[in-house]
Amino acid sequence: MSDWTPSLYLHFAAERSRPAVELLARVPLENIEYVADLGCGPGNSTALLHHRWPAARITGIDSSPAMIAEARSALPDCQFVEADIRNWQPKQALDLIFANASLQWLPDHYELFPHLVSLLSPQGVLAVQMPDNWLEPTHVLMREVAWEQNYPDRGREPLAGVHAYYDILSEAGCEVDIWRTTYYHQMPSHQAIIDWVTATGLRPWLQDLTESEQQHFLTRYHQMLEEQYPLQENGQILLAFPRLFIVARRTE
């Protein structure tokens, strides 16, 4: 599991794209020239940006070679760069930095967010969506299984919180619009939940395990999911998925 798997990620393309659509709807920009899509993945969010601003110069950034290859194939009119978000430097100030479900993987948000604001043009916008599910059973159980089986903690850190992000971005010279939404995704089975998180949040926990260790981990994880996520009357499972949204406009 050394690289991301675009096909697995896109298995839930509609569910993963919906937050990007709703984030983009709140971006208060019309005619813009330079856009960066940070953590563009296979290009599903980049396609939304290209549709809204077809004349803009859009650059997608991702550290995964497989994701970049998929995005280039899907969107030949956009530029894609394989790079670490923390180190990438645009050649010009950006009118929009769009980061859908990517910045939660990076540490030091107290430094990262002001840095991203510094890359914006005057009145430029930083638009961010991050999964806020560190305390949800899906992620709590990952940590519990790892503890039970004596595996190292590979999970990401929790988000800083609404008040912290507001202060960080206000102090960086931005007007801040921030909100939190919980989606309830209808899942046909507990295995479907595993398929969902295997493409994202579960990857760090599995990537250094042997095949037999992975199977042992997933078997126990499946058992614990069954305890935490009961079936609805129609046999479906409702997967609660909180997400944090931020639209920060530079005023300085």
From Swiss-Prot:
CDD domains for the chain: AdoMet_MTases
GO molecular function, one term: trans-aconitate 2-methyltransferase activity
Encoding gene, per UniProt annotation: tam
Keywords from the UniProt entry: Cytoplasm, Methyltransferase, S-adenosyl-L-methionine, Transferase
Reactions it catalyzes: trans-aconitate + S-adenosyl-L-methionine = (E)-3-(methoxycarbonyl)pent-2-enedioate + S-adenosyl-L-homocysteine
InterPro entries tied to this protein: Methyltransf_25 (IPR041698), SAM-dependent_MTases_sf (IPR029063), Trans-aconitate_MeTrfase (IPR023506), Trans_acon_MeTrfase_C (IPR023149)
NCBIfam families xrefs: PRK01683.1
Name assigned to this protein: Trans-aconitate 2-methyltransferase
Compartment(s) where it occurs, according to its Swiss-Prot or TrEMBL record: Cytoplasm
GO biological process, one term: methylation
EC number: 2.1.1.144
GO terms under cellular component: cytoplasm
Protein role: Catalyzes the S-adenosylmethionine monomethyl esterification of trans-aconitate.
